[in-house]
């Protein structure tokens, strides 16, 4: 059964396809229309603006804090009763260098503030911070899927792996459309969305 959506789709496969198509198109617009430049850097408000833009045509909850508890495998994301406080703490975390930025990213992943679309929106948010603070972005096409997922799974206990992995993929091509579009495709690939190429939408 598909997650409740604005498209009236009841098949999970149909929803996944449309969600990928529509939100990848919106992700491209974030870059092409320079909309990211208008969003807060490194705050939940900035992340919510990204999430809202990506998913507003698909889900009523776009940009809004989830109202259910979430888990993936054996890992439980921040419980609802602590979520607001967690997000306020993340806003206050420093972002002055690479290590601090990744630590902030790891905490936002643990918070997992949205019902759906956390990973995809938070990777854009991470690049937005890196670009503004240290003049770099991650070239996600250089980050192996299995390595990334394993490093993120371990990151709440030990964040050294995700730091090493992302540091090795940093590029100073912060205004490259190709790096951004390939990055969106790779980001979606981590989550199993591979039907559409962002540049072709």
What are these model-predicted stretches?
Residues 1-201:
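FIC/Doc superfamily catalytic core
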